[in-house]
Amino acid sequence: MKIGLFFGSFNPIHVGHLIIGNYILNNTELDQVWYVISPQNPFKSQSGLLNEYHRLHLVNIAIEGEPGLKVCNIEFGLPKPSYTIDTLTYLEEKYPGVNFAIIMGEDSFTNLDKWKSGSIIKERYELYVYRRNGEAVYKAEDNKVYLVNAPLLNISSSYVREQIKAGKSIRYLVTDPVYNEIMKAGYYR
Protein backbone atom coordinates (compact mmCIF):
# COMPACT_ATOMS: atom_id res chain seq x y z
CA MET A 1 0.00 0.00 0.00
CA LYS A 2 1.17 3.51 -0.82
CA ILE A 3 -0.08 6.40 1.29
CA GLY A 4 0.39 10.12 0.67
CA LEU A 5 0.75 12.18 3.83
CA PHE A 6 -0.66 15.70 3.55
CA PHE A 7 0.71 17.51 6.61
CA GLY A 8 -0.86 20.72 7.84
CA SER A 9 -2.39 22.73 10.62
CA PHE A 10 -5.71 22.74 8.74
CA ASN A 11 -6.77 25.79 10.75
CA PRO A 12 -9.41 25.31 9.34
CA ILE A 13 -9.52 22.81 6.50
CA HIS A 14 -10.98 24.43 3.37
CA VAL A 15 -12.03 23.33 -0.10
CA GLY A 16 -8.55 24.00 -1.49
CA HIS A 17 -7.09 21.31 0.80
CA LEU A 18 -9.81 18.90 -0.30
CA ILE A 19 -9.32 19.58 -4.01
CA ILE A 20 -5.59 18.88 -3.69
CA GLY A 21 -6.08 15.65 -1.73
CA ASN A 22 -8.80 14.40 -4.07
CA TYR A 23 -6.84 15.29 -7.20
CA ILE A 24 -3.68 13.56 -5.99
CA LEU A 25 -5.66 10.48 -4.94
CA ASN A 26 -7.34 10.25 -8.35
CA ASN A 27 -4.34 11.10 -10.52
CA THR A 28 -1.40 9.25 -8.95
CA GLU A 29 -0.63 5.69 -7.87
CA LEU A 30 -1.34 6.52 -4.20
CA ASP A 31 -3.91 4.25 -2.57
CA GLN A 32 -4.88 6.74 0.13
CA VAL A 33 -4.26 10.32 1.19
CA TRP A 34 -3.97 10.98 4.92
CA TYR A 35 -4.52 14.49 6.25
CA VAL A 36 -1.96 14.63 9.08
CA ILE A 37 -3.05 17.24 11.62
CA SER A 38 -0.01 19.03 13.04
CA PRO A 39 -0.71 20.21 16.60
CA GLN A 40 2.22 22.63 16.46
CA ASN A 41 4.12 23.54 13.31
CA PRO A 42 7.68 24.64 14.16
CA PHE A 43 7.51 27.31 11.43
CA LYS A 44 4.16 28.86 12.41
CA SER A 45 2.91 30.94 15.31
CA GLN A 46 0.56 29.32 17.82
CA SER A 47 -1.50 32.51 17.89
CA GLY A 48 -5.01 31.90 16.58
CA LEU A 49 -4.47 28.15 16.35
CA LEU A 50 -7.68 26.29 17.14
CA ASN A 51 -7.36 23.37 19.57
CA GLU A 52 -5.95 20.33 17.75
CA TYR A 53 -8.97 18.15 18.61
CA HIS A 54 -11.36 20.72 17.15
CA ARG A 55 -9.26 20.82 13.96
CA LEU A 56 -9.24 17.02 13.88
CA HIS A 57 -13.03 17.00 14.11
CA LEU A 58 -13.33 19.56 11.29
CA VAL A 59 -11.11 17.46 9.01
CA ASN A 60 -13.10 14.33 9.88
CA ILE A 61 -16.41 15.91 8.94
CA ALA A 62 -14.89 17.48 5.80
CA ILE A 63 -13.75 14.13 4.36
CA GLU A 64 -16.56 11.95 5.67
CA GLY A 65 -17.75 9.53 3.00
CA GLU A 66 -14.57 9.72 0.90
CA PRO A 67 -12.99 6.25 1.26
CA GLY A 68 -9.52 7.18 -0.05
CA LEU A 69 -9.16 10.23 2.19
CA LYS A 70 -8.31 9.66 5.85
CA VAL A 71 -7.46 11.79 8.85
CA CYS A 72 -4.38 11.07 10.94
CA ASN A 73 -3.77 12.37 14.45
CA ILE A 74 -0.46 10.53 14.95
CA GLU A 75 1.37 13.76 15.84
CA PHE A 76 -0.91 14.36 18.84
CA GLY A 77 1.07 11.75 20.79
CA LEU A 78 4.52 12.84 19.61
CA PRO A 79 6.73 15.55 21.16
CA LYS A 80 5.88 19.11 20.15
CA PRO A 81 6.69 20.87 17.95
CA SER A 82 6.05 18.28 15.26
CA TYR A 83 8.87 17.47 12.88
CA THR A 84 8.02 15.58 9.70
CA ILE A 85 11.04 13.27 9.89
CA ASP A 86 10.06 12.15 13.41
CA THR A 87 6.49 11.49 12.32
CA LEU A 88 7.67 9.50 9.30
CA THR A 89 9.99 7.39 11.46
CA TYR A 90 7.14 6.66 13.88
CA LEU A 91 4.69 5.80 11.09
CA GLU A 92 7.16 3.43 9.43
CA GLU A 93 7.58 1.57 12.73
CA LYS A 94 3.82 1.44 13.30
CA TYR A 95 2.93 0.43 9.72
CA PRO A 96 5.72 -1.80 8.37
CA GLY A 97 5.34 -2.54 4.68
CA VAL A 98 3.47 0.67 3.91
CA ASN A 99 5.21 3.07 1.54
CA PHE A 100 4.73 6.66 2.64
CA ALA A 101 5.01 9.67 0.36
CA ILE A 102 4.66 13.34 1.26
CA ILE A 103 2.27 15.86 -0.26
CA MET A 104 3.39 19.47 0.02
CA GLY A 105 3.04 22.86 -1.58
CA GLU A 106 5.72 24.32 -3.79
CA ASP A 107 6.51 26.87 -1.07
CA SER A 108 7.23 24.11 1.47
CA PHE A 109 9.30 22.20 -1.08
CA THR A 110 11.53 25.21 -1.75
CA ASN A 111 12.15 25.51 2.02
CA LEU A 112 12.69 21.79 2.63
CA ASP A 113 16.41 22.28 3.25
CA LYS A 114 15.48 24.36 6.34
CA TRP A 115 13.47 21.48 7.83
CA LYS A 116 14.87 19.09 10.40
CA SER A 117 16.54 16.35 8.29
CA GLY A 118 15.17 17.89 5.09
CA SER A 119 17.89 16.27 2.98
CA ILE A 120 17.01 12.84 4.40
CA ILE A 121 13.34 13.43 3.56
CA LYS A 122 14.33 14.26 -0.04
CA GLU A 123 16.48 11.13 -0.26
CA ARG A 124 14.07 8.61 1.22
CA TYR A 125 10.57 9.69 0.26
CA GLU A 126 8.61 10.46 -2.85
CA LEU A 127 7.34 14.03 -2.76
CA TYR A 128 4.15 15.16 -4.46
CA VAL A 129 4.52 18.90 -4.86
CA TYR A 130 1.43 20.82 -5.90
CA ARG A 131 1.83 23.84 -8.11
CA ARG A 132 -0.39 26.65 -9.27
CA ASN A 133 -0.33 26.06 -13.04
CA GLY A 134 -0.28 23.29 -15.61
CA GLU A 135 -2.60 20.38 -16.24
CA ALA A 136 -1.08 17.01 -15.39
CA VAL A 137 1.08 15.10 -12.98
CA TYR A 138 4.62 14.65 -14.28
CA LYS A 139 7.99 13.66 -12.92
CA ALA A 140 10.54 16.35 -12.21
CA GLU A 141 14.24 15.83 -12.87
CA ASP A 142 14.60 14.31 -9.42
CA ASN A 143 13.04 10.85 -9.71
CA LYS A 144 11.39 11.14 -6.27
CA VAL A 145 9.69 14.50 -6.86
CA TYR A 146 6.38 14.65 -8.71
CA LEU A 147 5.05 18.06 -9.67
CA VAL A 148 1.28 17.95 -9.37
CA ASN A 149 -0.78 20.46 -11.27
CA ALA A 150 -3.96 20.14 -9.26
CA PRO A 151 -6.66 22.74 -9.73
CA LEU A 152 -6.03 25.28 -6.99
CA LEU A 153 -8.01 28.08 -5.45
CA ASN A 154 -6.24 31.15 -4.19
CA ILE A 155 -7.55 30.77 -0.64
CA SER A 156 -5.83 29.94 2.61
CA SER A 157 -6.85 29.03 6.13
CA SER A 158 -5.72 32.47 7.28
CA TYR A 159 -8.05 34.05 4.68
CA VAL A 160 -10.95 31.92 5.97
CA ARG A 161 -10.20 33.02 9.55
CA GLU A 162 -9.99 36.69 8.49
CA GLN A 163 -13.37 36.44 6.77
CA ILE A 164 -14.92 34.96 9.91
CA LYS A 165 -13.43 37.69 12.13
CA ALA A 166 -14.75 40.33 9.74
CA GLY A 167 -18.24 38.82 9.92
CA LYS A 168 -18.19 37.80 6.25
CA SER A 169 -19.49 34.57 4.76
CA ILE A 170 -17.23 31.55 4.32
CA ARG A 171 -20.07 29.38 3.00
CA TYR A 172 -18.30 28.34 -0.22
CA LEU A 173 -14.75 28.26 1.16
CA VAL A 174 -15.38 25.20 3.35
CA THR A 175 -17.68 22.18 3.11
CA ASP A 176 -21.20 22.51 4.51
CA PRO A 177 -20.49 20.33 7.58
CA VAL A 178 -17.36 22.38 8.38
CA TYR A 179 -19.25 25.63 7.86
CA ASN A 180 -22.07 24.51 10.14
CA GLU A 181 -19.65 23.38 12.87
CA ILE A 182 -17.61 26.60 12.76
CA MET A 183 -20.76 28.72 12.96
CA LYS A 184 -22.33 26.60 15.72
CA ALA A 185 -19.18 26.53 17.86
CA GLY A 186 -18.19 30.14 17.19
CA TYR A 187 -14.65 29.24 16.10
CA TYR A 188 -12.25 31.96 14.92
CA ARG A 189 -14.35 34.93 16.05
Which residues does each predicted region cover?
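Nucleotidyltransferase catalytic core that binds NTPs
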Residues: 1-189
